[in-house]
Amino acid sequence: MSKLKELPLSALQFYATAPYACSYLEGRLARSQVATPAHLINADVYSKLVRAGFRRSGIFTYRPHCDDCHACTPCRVVVAPFVPSRAQRRAAERHQSLEALVAPLTYVEEHYQLYLLYQSVRHAGGGMDHDSRDQYEQFLLQSRVNSRLVEFREPPESESAGRLRMVSMIDVLEDGLSSVYTFYDPLERKASYGTYNVLWQIAQAQALELPYVYLGYWIEQSRKMAYKAQFQPLELLVNGEWRRFEDVAPAAARPAE
């Protein structure tokens, strides 16, 4: 993790939050380091912060700052040499007919209802399954950086023509795309929407000639976060330096050949 003095952001201040229940590892306490003031964090500054391991939730920019745990490791896909695995190719083929519409961050009631359904099925009891409209908007639709909303729908010729399947929020950085949050139809048990979404972002970054897709934090002990290791080549931010996944990750965490 980069030291504060290494950040070329002298106008910003950083503070640590009080401990709170970790949302990834049960029974653990977490703390975050928050960058302030929010109004100074424009797209250029945010790009630098992301390279230093920060993420954002609405207008709040943060990174893990836990007392006795370092499980959250920033990760990014190197897109130029990326080759999908067999399972990823199957996911791409299964969902390639979905129509993607890129738009500014905008409230749509249909999106909000899908978000509530996703939270109630995939993260029941996590606290977000009862988010109000205001909480939803503050979490996903407030941004001071270069952000996009992408919705994925069934094509007109399908049996479920126009049905909303997935919504993704993405930030455009100087050196890549940053995946903010994605939610999708959780009732389609055989679908691979999450995998397809990452593949779609990688393809977009390649088309834009951006070198990376930032996927947030890789957490080996968390099933919800460990999947990111399936997208190779992956780099991890360790001791302030971006290094190849295979050079720093435990052998057991590496994807099968």
Curated annotation (Swiss-Prot):
Q: Which UniProt keywords apply?
A: Acyltransferase, Cytoplasm, Transferase
On the tree of life, the source organism's domain of life is Bacteria
Quote a single Gene Ontology cellular component term: cytoplasm
InterPro entries xrefs? Acyl_CoA_acyltransferase, Asp_Glu_LeuTrfase, N-end_Aminoacyl_Trfase, N-end_Aminoacyl_Trfase_C, N-end_Aminoacyl_Trfase_N
- In the Enzyme Commission scheme, what number(s) does this protein have? 2.3.2.29
Q: Where in the cell is it found?
A: Cytoplasm
User: Does Iron-sulfur show up as a keyword for this record?
Assistant: no
Reactions this protein catalyses:
N-terminal L-glutamyl-[protein] + L-leucyl-tRNA(Leu) = N-terminal L-leucyl-L-glutamyl-[protein] + tRNA(Leu) + H(+); N-terminal L-aspartyl-[protein] + L-leucyl-tRNA(Leu) = N-terminal L-leucyl-L-aspartyl-[protein] + tRNA(Leu) + H(+)
Task: Show the coiled coil region(s).
Answer: none
The main enzyme category here is transferase
A molecular function (GO) held by this record is: arginyl-tRNA--protein transferase activity
Q: Which GO terms describe its biological process?
A: ubiquitin-dependent protein catabolic process via the N-end rule pathway
Q: Does the keyword Acyltransferase apply?
A: yes
NCBIfam families cross-referenced by the UniProt entry? PRK01305.1-1, PRK01305.1-3, PRK01305.2-3
Q: Which family does it belong to?
A: Belongs to the R-transferase family. Bpt subfamily.
Function recorded in the entry: Functions in the N-end rule pathway of protein degradation where it conjugates Leu from its aminoacyl-tRNA to the N-termini of proteins containing an N-terminal aspartate or glutamate.
The entry's protein name is Aspartate/glutamate leucyltransferase
| Organism (species) | Ralstonia nicotianae (strain ATCC BAA-1114 / GMI1000)
Q: What is the lineage of its organism?
A: Bacteria, Pseudomonadati, Pseudomonadota, Betaproteobacteria, Burkholderiales
